[in-house]
């Protein structure tokens, strides 16, 4: 009787829990695919802001997102 209980517990409780963990990865993969659709300028802007770096701008066009490179 104990063996049947262990087998039932394994297949009815543990096996479904193990398969549910695989489903949790799907939203992350979808999000990564959406990021690839950005144009290169938007991607560069996101990367630079994440790294805390600013680009160099020519003197009349200097603003908060870049510094003047002369």
Curated annotation (Swiss-Prot):
Tissue specificity: Expressed by the venom duct.
Keyword list, A-Z: Cleavage on pair of basic residues, Disulfide bond, Secreted, Signal, Toxin
The keyword Disulfide bond is assigned to this record: yes
Cellular localization per UniProt: Secreted
Cellular component terms (Gene Ontology): extracellular region
Segment forming the signal sequence: 1-24
Record InterPro entries: Conotoxin (IPR004214)
Propeptide: 25-53
S-S pairs: 56-68, 57-66, 62-69
Gene Ontology MF annotations: ion channel inhibitor activity; toxin activity
Membership in a protein family: Belongs to the conotoxin M superfamily.
Domain notes: The cysteine framework is III (CC-C-C-CC). Classified in the M-1 branch, since 1 residue stands between the fourth and the fifth cysteine residues.
Name this polypeptide is given: Conotoxin Lt3.2
Lineage per the UniProt record: Eukaryota, Metazoa, Spiralia, Lophotrochozoa, Mollusca
């Amino acid at each position: 009787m104990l063996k049947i209980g262990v087998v039932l517990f394994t297949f009815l409780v543990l096996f479904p829990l193990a398969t549910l963990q695989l489903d949790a990865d799907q939203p992350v993969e979808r999000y990564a695919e959406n990021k690839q659709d950005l144009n290169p300028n938007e991607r560069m802007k996101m990367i630079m802001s994440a790294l805390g770096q600013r680009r160099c701008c020519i003197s009349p066009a200097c603003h908060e997102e870049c510094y003047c490179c002369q």
